[in-house]
Regions:
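Conserved MFS/SLC helix-loop-helix module at the cytosolic interface between two early adjacent transmembrane helices
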Residues: 74-112
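A membrane-interface helix-boundary motif in multi-pass transporters
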Residues: 173-185, 405-420
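C-terminal transmembrane helical hairpin of 12-TM major facilitator-type secondary transporters
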Residues: 310, 315-366
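Cytosolic juxtamembrane N-terminal segment immediately preceding the first transmembrane helix
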Residues: 1-38
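Helix-breaking motifs and short loop linkers at transmembrane-helix boundaries and internal kinks
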Residues: 55, 87, 108-114, 125, ...
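Intracellular cytosolic loops and amphipathic helices of Major Facilitator Superfamily
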Residues: 1-15, 198-257, 440-454
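Extracytoplasmic gate region of multi-pass secondary transporters
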Residues: 43-44, 250-309
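Glycine-rich segments within core transmembrane alpha-helices of 12-TM secondary carriers
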Residues: 145-173, 187-188, 387-397
Length: 454
């Protein structure tokens, strides 16, 4: 009698080098995040034209941007449990179709009220796409490279935002703001069919859901041709936590860690958004020109890609909580130091670059940390809820920034205050690292689909 093989999917992925199929999955993930970044950045590029054509105020533009951010938060919060129930691929493809459709609809807006509604609907799709593609890619990444791979795909956000800027510089003068919105919708609608064809469902999700062995085997044969025989009986480890995805995220085993992830990401996005939005206004108030303010803000954002790659690299080499805590701490210190460099444009630019690299990089690294923390059956929910709570921080940053401007605080006081959320990110990571670093899967198994799916 031929002996039945019982391969461990987790170990199979971990012991093999990256295959061509895994690299394709990473590339597709990068593209989804890039489309997300392009679409989210669009409003910033069309805002000056809208003010001229429609005569809208900054307050009205702020409402449109806030509507999109609220949609992003809700899309993230509700999509995670759906992805843990229906599958990552279905949610990703539908969300890409969804935000593509509503972005095209936005191009036909006739007033601010219509645009607010359309951007809210767009935000729902954008919020669903980003955390779930991160979850799917993480489940195909070897654990030794998982953090770096996740930060690589999230670098697609800055790539997409930059592509939006270059597109805007040519399209808007030639064809108007509607053309940029149309492009932002057409690209995801064209890309979604490619995802249907090329993107696989997470093999670890299929294991948890006890999918047919033939379907799992087909994906594994694309990953590692010749390593999986037809005579295979897959098994599943005992569940690391009981209940559905939402109960697992909020359970005694994972609840404290979830709260710390939410705290850190809330404060991290609060910091990045408040600096990205209000930095030009702050530096203009201390005598710098509009051109200098724009250059310094661009330098602040440019540091994010380098910082993200460094964060992922460091997380794969030392304790990830320590790695992110150090990076957030450095970012907070350099942010506070900016308050004492008002007299030197060159020094402010240097400090802004390091601050942006650290804060943006650490925020990207949080996606890798959440993917490492949760088991497969709750990973999409855990990561998406972290994104949703973080987006609330981004929304509140707009109001906090306006309040600080209204108080006419001294330049250095504003940056010292921003040291508080930075300190809270470090404290949250330290607490999670001490009390909820992670929960390895239970070793025992029960008959089902595939073993090692965590």
């Amino acid at each position: 009698m031929t002996q039945t093989q019982r391969p461990d999917v987790r170990e199979l992925i971990n012991r093999n080098p990256l295959s061509r199929f895994q690299k394709l999955i990473i590339f597709l993930g990068f593209c989804v995040i890039a489309l997300d970044g392009f679409d989210i950045a669009i409003m910033g590029f069309i805002a000056p034209t809208l003010k001229l054509e429609w005569g809208v105020s900054n307050h009205q533009l702020g409402l449109v941007i806030s509507a999109a951010l609220i949609g992003l938060a809700l899309g993230a919060i509700f999509s995670g449990p759906l992805a843990d129930w229906l599958g990552r691929k279905k949610i990703i493809i539908n969300s890409v179709f969804f935000f593509g459709f509503w972005t095209i609809a936005t191009a036909f807006s006739h007033n601010v009220e219509q645009m607010m509604f359309f951007r809210f609907m767009t935000g729902l799709g954008l919020g669903a796409a980003m955390p779930n593609i991160g979850t799917l890619v993480s489940e195909y990444a070897p654990e030794r490279q998982r953090s770096f791979i996740i930060t690589v795909i999230f670098c697609g956000f800055t790539f997409g935002a930059a592509a939006g800027g270059f597109s805007a510089s040519w399209l808007i003068p030639q064809f108007g703001w509607h053309s940029l919105m149309a492009l932002g919708g057409i690209l995801p609608l064209l890309f979604a069919p490619l995802l249907i064809w090329l993107l696989p469902e997470s093999v670890r999700f299929l294991v948890i859901k006890q999918a047919p062995a033939a379907r799992i085997r087909a994906i594994l044969n694309r990953l590692y041709p010749g390593q999986i025989s037809d005579n295979v009986r897959f098994i599943l480890p005992a569940q690391p936590a009981a209940g559905n995805a939402m109960r697992i995220v909020l359970s005694r085993q994972y609840g404290f860690g979830s709260l710390m992830l939410w705290l850190v990401y809330f404060m991290g996005l609060f910091l990045v958004y408040i600096l990205g939005s209000w930095l030009p206004t702050l530096v203009k108030a201390v005598g710098m020109t509009v051109s200098q303010a724009a250059i310094m803000t661009a330098i602040y954002q440019a540091g994010g890609t380098l910082g993200s790659l460094f964060a992922g690299w460091l997380m794969d080499r030392i304790n990830p909580h320590r790695a992110l805590g150090i990076i957030y701490a450095i970012g907070g210190l350099f942010t506070m130091a900016m308050g004492y460099a008002a007299g030197s444009f060159a020094l402010l630019c240097m400090l802004a670059f390091i601050s942006g690299a650290c804060l943006n990089g650490a925020n990207t690294g949080m996606n890798a940390l959440s993917a490492r923390y949760y088991p497969t059956q709750a990973r999409a929910t855990g990561s998406s809820w972290m994104h949703g709570v973080g987006r609330i921080g981004a929304i509140l940053s707009a109001f906090a920034g306006a309040e600080m401007m209204a108080l006419n605080l001294p330049f250095e006081s504003v940056f010292l205050i921003l040291g508080i959320p930075a300190a809270l990110t470090v404290a949250g990571l330290a607490a999670k690292g001490i009390f909820a670093a992670g929960h390895p899967p239970v070793a025992s198994t029960s008959p089902a689909s595939v073993r090692g799916a965590s």
